Amino acid sequence: MGAPRFEEYLPNYTYDDYKLWGGDWELIDGIPYAMSPSPMKDHQLIASNFLFELRVGIKDCSNCMVVSELDWKLNDSTTIRPDVVVLCDEPHDKYITKAPQIIVEVISKSTAMRDEKIKFQIYQEEKVPYYIIAYPDDLRAKVYKLVDGKYDKQGDLTHEVFQFDDIECSASVDFDNIFKRFRK
């Protein structure tokens, strides 16, 4: 006798359900994940720093934009909300419909496993060219680049300038600017 299977008892919500919920949620393979409590001040400041750095970096690229907290509807059972994304040629105005060029997630204790494992896998499968995971407690960020369908770690960055030059709108991020105000 094999191990019991419980998949049939798990909830299986859809985007239509998701739209009706109050508060902040993500929906991954039909399972809801609460995005509460709201992010701490340092989390929001670091996300804002990425938003600014990336906006400055792509300012001359008219078909790309940098946004935060916008839903990405992958299919009817998966809708996620990255912290910061670089979008190019996005036709929809209510949610993201195609893979962003760059995604930034700022880690918190409550989202670490989801950002480092589940979303890492989703972003890799969806062919997001760059995934940045920022760690406020360590004042560093891991930068991953999609190479032959798999993420290759480009480094743990703290003070460096990283150039994203093989995407539609090249950009750079000065990681010293991202973390400077938090250094003692």
Question: What spans do the regions from the language model cover?
Answer:
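Gly/Pro/Ser/Thr-rich low-complexity, intrinsically disordered segments predominantly at protein N-termini
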Residues: 1-184
